[in-house]
UniProtKB/Swiss-Prot annotation:
<dbReference type="GO" id="GO:0006782">
    <property type="term" value="P:protoporphyrinogen IX biosynthetic process"/>
</dbReference>
<comment type="pathway">
    <text>Porphyrin-containing compound metabolism; protoporphyrin-IX biosynthesis; coproporphyrinogen-III from 5-aminolevulinate: step 2/4.</text>
</comment>
<dbReference type="Pfam" id="PF01379">
    <property type="entry name" value="Porphobil_deam"/>
</dbReference>
<dbReference type="InterPro" id="IPR022418">
    <property type="entry name" value="Porphobilinogen_deaminase_C"/>
</dbReference>
<protein>
    <recommendedName>
        <fullName>Porphobilinogen deaminase</fullName>
        <ecNumber>2.5.1.61</ecNumber>
    </recommendedName>
</protein>
<keyword id="KW-0808">Transferase</keyword>
<comment type="function">
    <text>Tetrapolymerization of the monopyrrole PBG into the hydroxymethylbilane pre-uroporphyrinogen in several discrete steps.</text>
</comment>
<dbReference type="GO" id="GO:0004418">
    <property type="term" value="F:hydroxymethylbilane synthase activity"/>
</dbReference>
<dbReference type="InterPro" id="IPR000860">
    <property type="entry name" value="HemC"/>
</dbReference>
<dbReference type="InterPro" id="IPR036803">
    <property type="entry name" value="Porphobilinogen_deaminase_C_sf"/>
</dbReference>
<comment type="subunit">
    <text>Monomer.</text>
</comment>
<dbReference type="InterPro" id="IPR022417">
    <property type="entry name" value="Porphobilin_deaminase_N"/>
</dbReference>
<comment type="similarity">
    <text>Belongs to the HMBS family.</text>
</comment>
<dbReference type="Pfam" id="PF03900">
    <property type="entry name" value="Porphobil_deamC"/>
</dbReference>
<dbReference type="GO" id="GO:0005737">
    <property type="term" value="C:cytoplasm"/>
</dbReference>
<feature type="modified residue" description="S-(dipyrrolylmethanemethyl)cysteine">
    <location>
        <position position="238"/>
    </location>
</feature>
<keyword id="KW-0627">Porphyrin biosynthesis</keyword>
Length: 290
C-alpha cells in the first residue's frame, strides 16, 4: 500500500502527535506514513483571543479542506480542537491515545497555585480556565495569551506574568512537565472535553477508515465521546466555559462536569454503566441545566 498522508497543524506538538499515530499505524498495520503540515486560521492569527473567533474549528478547518480535496488521507488532531458538531462529510475513526487530561500551573517561582502572591497575573486564552481560576481565587488577574506551548511559557518572563495554565498532556508530550508547579484536580479546573486525546479524522467515504479504526483505544474513545456529547447537549463549543471529565473502569463510567451559569459555577457528577453512556451524558447535561 502507498504511504498514507497525514495532515495536521504545523507545530512541534502536532508533529509529536503525528509521530505517535504514524508509529501505531506502522506497528499495527504495517503501513508507512508521511506528514503534511497545514497552517490553520488559529495558527496564523495569534493575537485574537480564542473566544473571539466567530466560527468553530479555528484549528481544523483548513485541515478538513485538505481532506475534502484529497490532498491528505487522514487528519490528526488534538481532539479538544474538533467542534462537537462535525460536518457530515467527516468522522472520527479512532482515538489513538489519551494522556492525562488535567490542567496545570507553571509559575514563575515554582510555587503552587494557592501560594501565588495576592492579585497574581496568570496567562491563558481559555474562557473555561479563566472561569475556574476566578472561582478558586477571586484575586487572580487573568491575562489573555496566545501561541504554542513554548511561546506561552516564554511569556511568563516577557509579559511579567506570575504563571500560565496549560494542558498537562501537552507538557508531557513535549517533555516539559518538569516545569509544572501545580496540577489542578478535575474538581478545581474541569478539563475541556477531549483534552489529552489524539484522534484520527477521515472522510466518511474514506477507503482507509476501517483499517485505521483498528488502532482505536476503546476506553479513550468512550470517555471522549461522552465528554463531547455533554458539550453538545449543553450547546457549547470548543472555547466555551464548559468542562467535562469522564473516566472508565471496566464496565463503569464516572463523570464530572461544570458550567458557568450567570456568575456561579455549577458542578455535577454521575456514574453508571458504559452501555448507558448516551443516556448518562444526557442526564449529566440536564443536571447542569437545572
Amino acid at each position: 500500500m502507498k504511504k498514507l498522508r497525514i495532515g495536521a497543524r504545523d507545530s512541534k506538538l502536532s508533529r509529536i502527535q503525528v509521530d505517535i499515530v504514524a508509529r501505531k499505524i506502522k506497528q499495527t498495520l504495517g503501513i508507512e506514513c508521511e506528514f503534511v503540515p497545514i497552517k490553520t486560521k488559529g495558527d496564523i492569527d495569534k493575537t485574537k483571543s480564542l473566544k473571539d473567533f466567530k466560527s468553530p474549528g479555528v484549528f481544523v478547518k483548513e485541515i478538513e479542506l485538505a481532506l475534502l480535496s484529497r490532498e491528505i488521507d487522514l487528519a490528526v488532531h488534538s481532539l479538544k480542537d474538533l467542534p462537537c458538531e462535525m460536518d457530515s462529510n467527516f468522522e472520527i475513526v479512532a482515538v489513538v491515545e489519551r494522556e492525562d487530561p488535567r490542567d496545570v500551573l507553571v509559575s514563575k517561582d515554582g510555587v503552587g497555585f494557592y501560594q501565588l502572591k495576592p492579585n497574581a497575573k496568570i496567562g491563558t486564552s481559555s474562557l473555561r480556565r479563566e472561569v475556574h481560576l476566578k472561582n478558586l481565587r477571586q484575586d487572580i488577574q487573568v491575562v489573555n495569551i496566545r501561541g504554542n506551548i513554548e511561546t506561552r511559557l516564554s511569556k511568563i518572563e516577557s509579559e511579567g506574568l506570575d504563571g500560565v495554565v496549560l494542558a498537562y498532556a501537552a507538557l508531557k508530550r513535549l517533555n516539559l512537565d518538569s516545569h509544572v508547579s501545580y496540577i489542578f484536580d478535575v474538581n478545581e479546573i474541569t478539563p475541556c472535553p477531549g483534552q489529552g486525546a489524539i484522534c484520527i479524522e477521515c472522510l466518511k467515504d474514506s477507503p482507509y477508515k476501517n483499517i485505521l479504526s483498528k488502532i482505536n483505544d476503546a476506553d479513550a474513545y468512550i470517555q471522549t465521546q461522552f465528554e463531547r456529547l455533554v458539550l453538545k447537549f449543553l450547546g457549547g463549543g470548543c472555547h466555551s466555559s464548559i468542562g467535562v471529565f469522564c473516566k472508565t473502569d471496566q464496565d463503569k463510567i464516572y463523570a464530572f462536569a461544570s458550567i458557568l451559569s450567570g456568575d456561579k459555577l455549577i458542578k455535577a457528577s454521575i456514574e453508571g454503566d458504559k452501555d448507558d453512556f448516551l443516556s448518562l451524558a444526557n442526564k449529566l447535561s440536564n443536571m447542569l441545566k437545572s
